[in-house]
Amino acid sequence: MDTLINELTLYAKIDTNRIPYNFAKINVGEYFNDCIEEIGLDLESKNIGLAYFNYTDGSTQIIADPEQLRRVIHNIIGNSIKYLDKQRGLINIRIKDVGDFIQVEIEDNGRGIAAADLPYIFDRFYRADASRNSATGGSGIGLSIVKKIIEDHGGKIWATSKESIGTVMYFVIRK
């Protein structure tokens, strides 16, 4: 219940533009290396494999709020963990340079999302599989928070998925 209240409070603040973003130039390699190190320890303890590929050069920078970007990454990874149903879960993270943006791809080999549900996963309170929600927890607003943060950064977010194969979440952030 506390998590739901915290997420609703955060969403209300973001939605009414009451969260002051602290935008700064961030070195992509250094920032994501730190994130991967932190995430890797958690995934290792859960017996989930992690592969990380940074295809940007060492000097690539983005303009972002490091704390809010970390929230985005943790939320997406958290969802991947919740819906991994394979004996050996795997998460791949790829960072690519795409012109004026960097593109982040977070791929899992979980149960995937039905094509009918995919257009709605970023909507507030949307839950793709109600029968599994009570077991996995969550409020149904995590991805809508992620979308709002990415859009407030001048980026966009989308996903592709195949049932029983996995999901790839993509987002772009401006340089």
Descriptions of predicted regions:
Residues 22-37:
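A conserved beta-strand-to-alpha-helix junction within the catalytic ATP-binding
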Residues 16-21, 61-64:
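Conserved micro-motifs of the catalytic ATP-binding
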Residues 90-100:
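Short beta-strand/loop element within the Bergerat-fold HATPase_c
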Residues 113-127:
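Short conserved segment of the HATPase_c
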Residues 42-52:
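Short conserved segments within the C-terminal catalytic ATPase subdomain
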Residues 108:
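Acidic ATP/Mg2+-coordinating residue in the GHKL
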Residues 154-155:
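Conserved glycine-rich
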